[in-house]
């Protein structure tokens, strides 16, 4: 029994190729159904995100390998001539398990430690379950991957520290003010960056968030989504600067949207109560001279980038710990697979000796009393258990290579004259 993984990701293919092979949920369900119905796969799962489309397959036919699955996916997406085999990676057996463990643990992500991928893998497994393409092997593989990801998250710092500008800004504000729930926050700009910053603030329990934007309806839409319903007209928001403890700017502007005189006047009204200004604009939205004002803490993208770099370096230092967790779980998963592979032989071995026992006891059925026969049954059961203990233990023992398993199986089948000696390899 083997499991292969094949696909494209940010390491193997450019974005246009990844986009070309991306599968929607509807397509993924159809693709998996085709694999199972056509007998190509016994089990199958597809993980498809913006950065990867990866297939995890238990082959249903001898000719199904990585190259077969590459061509099948290319054909399904009608991408012949656009996508080449060298755009794909290919894994099999335990390397497939290792790859999924690394993906689920976010160490194979475009951004190291990016935790969103685990939810995407869980969604891929859900789809496989719904179309009944997840059997015993994929189910065990996925649940082990989920367990690995949980251990990595709780026992390492691989997912800690902001690695995006908007999140770094929020973390910095929390470090300075500690409790964001009691602070009043102004967001200038409701575009993608501003929206992310506002949502990160909300996740940190900030609730008093006021939004302003050149297009008022966009500010209102974001405020409604957050549940704050607090907006200011763009033309008049500067009249209220003194009311805010944190100001986040994220607008597209060639000129500064906040100048030193404006903030100096605001600070006088605040009686010099501290203010954090987080300038997420590019070009900068805030006059850098503002940073010289007393109790005014100004951080721009460069300052936040420094925080991000430190966090990424910290995450890289956690990689050996993650690798150790993955290695330990991989050993357990490999041993479980080996047990699956030898199970038919163990069943045959037990069945053969049980049959011998029944035949021999049958000879005494009418020669001894029922009580004596039961004692003989208990005695023979104990003898069989001791006889079979060593060969079964040997079959289940850990192996260094996959080739060891067939040789063990064949040895046992030959010694005990079991039928279908090549059952495992078939």
From Swiss-Prot:
The active site is at 50 (nucleophile). Catalyzes the NADPH-dependent reduction of glutamyl-tRNA(Glu) to glutamate 1-semialdehyde (GSA). It comes from the Bacteria. Homodimer. It comes from Chlorobium phaeobacteroides (strain BS1). Its EC number is 1.2.1.70. This is Glutamyl-tRNA reductase. During catalysis, the active site Cys acts as a nucleophile attacking the alpha-carbonyl group of tRNA-bound glutamate with the formation of a thioester intermediate between enzyme and glutamate, and the concomitant release of tRNA(Glu). The thioester intermediate is finally reduced by direct hydride transfer from NADPH, to form the product GSA. Coiled coil: none annotated. The record marks 99 as: Important for activity. One of its GO terms (biological process) is protoporphyrinogen IX biosynthetic process from glutamate. Belongs to the glutamyl-tRNA reductase family. It catalyses: (S)-4-amino-5-oxopentanoate + tRNA(Glu) + NADP(+) = L-glutamyl-tRNA(Glu) + NADPH + H(+). NADP(+) binds at residues 189-194. It is an enzyme of class 1 (oxidoreductase). Substrate binds at residues 49-52, 109, 114-116, 120. Pathway: Porphyrin-containing compound metabolism; protoporphyrin-IX biosynthesis; 5-aminolevulinate from L-glutamyl-tRNA(Glu): step 1/2; Porphyrin-containing compound metabolism; chlorophyll biosynthesis.
């Amino acid at each position: 029994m083997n499991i292969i993984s094949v696909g494209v990701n940010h390491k193997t293919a450019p974005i246009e190729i990844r986009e070309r092979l991306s599968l929607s949920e509807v397509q993924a369900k159809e693709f998996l159904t085709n694999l199972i119905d056509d007998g190509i796969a016994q089990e199958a799962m597809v993980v498809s995100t913006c950065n990867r489309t990866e297939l995890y397959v238990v082959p249903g036919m001898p000719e199904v390998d990585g190259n077969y699955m590459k061509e099948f996916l290319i054909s399904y997406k009608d991408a012949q001539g656009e996508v080449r085999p060298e755009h794909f990676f290919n894994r099999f057996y335990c390397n497939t398990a290792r790859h999924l463990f690394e993906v689920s643990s976010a160490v194979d992500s475009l951004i190291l430690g990016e935790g969103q991928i685990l939810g995407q893998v869980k969604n891929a497994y859900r789809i496989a379950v719904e179309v009944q393409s997840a059997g015993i092997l994929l189910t065990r593989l996925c649940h082990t991957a989920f367990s690995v990801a949980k251990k990595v998250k709780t026992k390492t710092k691989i997912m800690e520290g902001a690695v995006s500008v908007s999140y770094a800004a929020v973390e910095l504000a929390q470090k300075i003010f500690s409790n964001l729930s009691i602070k009043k926050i102004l967001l200038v700009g409701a575009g993608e960056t501003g929206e992310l910053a506002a949502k990160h603030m909300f996740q940190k329990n900030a609730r008093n968030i006021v939004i302003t934007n050149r297009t008022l309806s966009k500010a209102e839409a974001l405020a409604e989504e957050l549940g704050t319903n607090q907006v200011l007209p763009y033309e008049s928001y500067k009249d209220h600067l003194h009311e805010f403890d944190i100001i986040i700017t994220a607008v597209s502007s060639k000129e500064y949207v906040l100048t030193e005189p404006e903030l100096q006047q605001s600070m006088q009204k605040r009686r010099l109560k501290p203010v954090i200004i987080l300038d997420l604009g590019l070009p900068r939205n805030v006059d850098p001279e503002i940073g010289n004002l007393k109790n005014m803490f100004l951080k721009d993208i460069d300052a936040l980038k420094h925080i991000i770099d430190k966090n990424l370096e910290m995450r890289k230092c956690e990689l050996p710990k993650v690798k150790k967790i993955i290695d330990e779980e991989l050993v357990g998963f490999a041993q479980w697979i080996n047990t699956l592979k030898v199970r038919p032989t163990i069943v045959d071995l037990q069945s053969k000796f049980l049959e011998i026992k029944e035949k021999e006891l049958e000879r005494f059925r009418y020669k001894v009393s029922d009580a004596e026969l039961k004692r003989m049954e208990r005695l023979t059961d104990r003898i069989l258990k001791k006889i079979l203990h060593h060969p079964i233990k040997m079959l289940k023992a850990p192996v260094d290579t996959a080739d060891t398993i067939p040789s063990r199986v064949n040895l046992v089948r030959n010694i005990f004259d079991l039928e279908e000696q090549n059952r495992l390899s078939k």
